[in-house]
């Protein structure tokens, strides 16, 4: 099933399961001060034969998806990289933390600091393992079930402006196809999840290209799935809209290494969407 249909059904489920709580104004409290309603433990799955999962019932700002993912892959944690590419989605989190974000995703993906004092490039390592598996798929590979990248470095959590909401994630190689599963501890269903789906789907395509594999399936595990009180009307509006066919993703076929991708090497094709629905991010 198209992942957008699954996403909209999850929105409806949360509204239905929490109908009485919403009517009585009984919100689940959290660190932001903006109450939520939600559910726990859900899964979304997508096969890219149906298109690239950029939601169509509201406009996805794909430029920010690209900028943030390239920022992570560059191992950067500063705002300058994002601002140069017109992306300001991390500004509020930085403002709460004295203008700095700390050792968040990019640091952990590309320079995880171990207890032994060494740094580990998880992205380079996992791509190398995938290439080895793809080169000799009949040979048992010791790391075939260990293709995991994690941003959740317990020793660094207190220094982060925001501990990772999404990740770890795991790749899987089967029959010449590369699959990806993502685990998300905290899922802002209206603002965050559509962005996260597109970001990790893009990462899957990029890694598949540089490892010479076809793109397989995408699985997204959502734990604490919630809708903020101030975004309920936006969700209701989105649910009145009929989805369009999903767009396609174009990657520059000349790019063969993960660090070579630029903004211009990544484009959405035939992206037909409804107008944006604005909402205030709770931080």
UniProtKB/Swiss-Prot annotation:
Residues the record marks as active site: 165 (nucleophile)
Main localisation: cytoplasm
SUPFAM superfamilies: Thymidylate synthase/dCMP hydroxymethylase
Family: Belongs to the thymidylate synthase family. Bacterial-type ThyA subfamily.
Entry-linked InterPro entries: Thymidate_synth/dCMP_Mease, Thymidate_synth/dCMP_Mease_dom, Thymidate_synth/dCMP_Mease_sf, Thymidylate_synthase, Thymidylate_synthase_AS
GO cellular component: cytosol
EC class: transferase
Function: Catalyzes the reductive methylation of 2'-deoxyuridine-5'-monophosphate (dUMP) to 2'-deoxythymidine-5'-monophosphate (dTMP) while utilizing 5,10-methylenetetrahydrofolate (mTHF) as the methyl donor and reductant in the reaction, yielding dihydrofolate (DHF) as a by-product. This enzymatic reaction provides an intracellular de novo source of dTMP, an essential precursor for DNA biosynthesis.
Pathway listed: Pyrimidine metabolism; dTTP biosynthesis
Organism: Symbiobacterium thermophilum (strain DSM 24528 / JCM 14929 / IAM 14863 / T)
Reaction equation(s) it catalyzes: dUMP + (6R)-5,10-methylene-5,6,7,8-tetrahydrofolate = 7,8-dihydrofolate + dTMP
A Gene Ontology molecular function term of the record: thymidylate synthase activity
GO biological process: dTMP biosynthetic process; dTTP biosynthetic process; methylation
Keywords: Cytoplasm, Methyltransferase, Nucleotide biosynthesis, Transferase
Annotated compartments: Cytoplasm
Binding site for (6R)-5,10-methylene-5,6,7,8-tetrahydrofolate: 188, 282
Record keyword tRNA processing present: no
Assembly information from the UniProt record: Homodimer.
Name listed for the protein in its UniProt record: Thymidylate synthase
Positions with a binding annotation for dUMP: 31, 145-146, 185-188, 196, 226-228
EC number from the UniProt entry: 2.1.1.45
HAMAP family, sorted: Thymidy_synth_bact
């Amino acid at each position: 099933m198209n992942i957008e249909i699954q996403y909209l059904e999850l929105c409806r489920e949360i509204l239905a399961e929490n109908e009485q709580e919403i009517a009585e104004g009984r919100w689940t409290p959290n660190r932001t001060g903006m109450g939520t309603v939600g559910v726990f433990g859900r899964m979304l799955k997508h096969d890219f034969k149906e298109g690239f999962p950029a939601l169509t019932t509201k406009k996805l700002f794909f430029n920010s998806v690209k900028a943030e993912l390239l920022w992570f892959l560059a191992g950067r944690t500063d705002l300058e990289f994002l601002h140069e590419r017109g992306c300001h989605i991390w500004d509020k989190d930085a403002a709460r933390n004295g203008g700095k974000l700390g050792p968040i995703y990019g640091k952990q993906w590309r320079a995880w600091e171990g207890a032994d004092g060494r740094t580990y490039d998880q992205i380079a390592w996992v791509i190398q393992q995938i290439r080895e598996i793809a080169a000799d798929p009949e040979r048992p590979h010791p790391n075939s079930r260990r293709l995991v990248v994690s941003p959740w470095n317990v020793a660094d959590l207190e220094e982060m402006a925001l501990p990772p909401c999404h990740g770890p994630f795991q790749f899987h190689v089967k029959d010449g196809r590369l699959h990806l599963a993502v685990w998300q501890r905290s899922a802002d269903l209206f603002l965050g999840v559509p962005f996260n789906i597109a970001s990790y789907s893009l990462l899957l395509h990029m890694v598949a290209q540089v490892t010479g594999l076809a793109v397989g399936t995408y699985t997204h595990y959502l734990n604490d799935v919630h809708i903020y009180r101030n975004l309920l009307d936006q969700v209701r509006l989105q649910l009145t809209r009929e989805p369009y066919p999903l767009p396609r993703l174009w990657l520059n076929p000349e790019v063969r290494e993960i660090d070579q991708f630029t903004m211009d090497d990544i484009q959405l094709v035939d992206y037909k969407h409804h107008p944006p629905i604005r909402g205030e991010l709770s931080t």
